[in-house]
From Swiss-Prot:
Its cofactor is Zn(2+). GO terms for molecular function: metalloendopeptidase activity; zinc ion binding. The lineage of its organism: Bacteria, Bacillati, Bacillota, Bacilli, Lactobacillales. The gene is htpX. Belongs to the peptidase M48B family. This is Protease HtpX homolog. It comes from the Bacteria. It is a multi-pass membrane protein.
Amino acid sequence: MLYQQIARNKRKTALIMVLFVVILTLVGAGLGYLFSNSPWTGIIIALAGSLIYLLIMWQNPANMIMSLNHAQEIQEADNPELWHIVEDMAMVARVPMPRVFIIPDPSPNAFATGRDPEHSAVAVTQGILELMNREELEGVLGHELSHVRNYDILLSTIGVVLVGVISFISGIASRYIWFFGGNRRDDEDRDTNAFEIIFKVIAIVFVLILGPISASLAQMALSRNREYLADASSVELTRNPQGLISALRKIEGSQPMRQADRSSAGLYIENPFHNHGLSHLFDTHPPTEDRIKRLEHM
């Protein structure tokens, strides 16, 4: 089953990459139409910029994601207990020892990232170290190292990168429209017909709203089922479902994180922003109670 899941994750990576390229192309086309009346100019700029960003980040994606989340790398002497738990879980999972980071945030949480098991890293918050006992930490780190073993980190890293790119493009567009849109409209009103106005409105809506939402939904599609599998794999490693159950309950009852990066939310073991209501539709994690019920039946 493990090798089948790894193969599925690699196929999903290719499919999600295609989906993100489509979204990027549409966002770029809208951007080009708004700024120069040339969709192709925007497409070329968006795709070329994204490719350069991906190539730069791909050299060491863990470093950039850790930086976005204000995580600080540690060595064994800095926190021997945490180091040895990670070391033990890595040995049981049969993956290389990942780099270890601590996030200076009082809310308990953790995540893993990297492009493959040989270039992986795990991060835990200061809050999780203060709040949880060894059994709970083993459950959490077993979950994160299961993501490493199953190549989930590759999918998640790609999702973070591409959502970040699309959000960056949308941010540039919104600032440009805010500062310069009024002047352009005054100059162009005489020469603009009704169809051009409609197309510009559609382009604005897609670049500023639909593009980022579509990217977030694509990222969400990467995450939900993988959390259930990582929970089950953690129990396989620790032989103790109660440790992870207790950890999930403590995380669910905690305050939202202050140091987490929003584009990285899907990486964490539990949503660091604790979305509720309508925003739960866009959550990258299954409901905690559903996860706990599955663990209780193992």
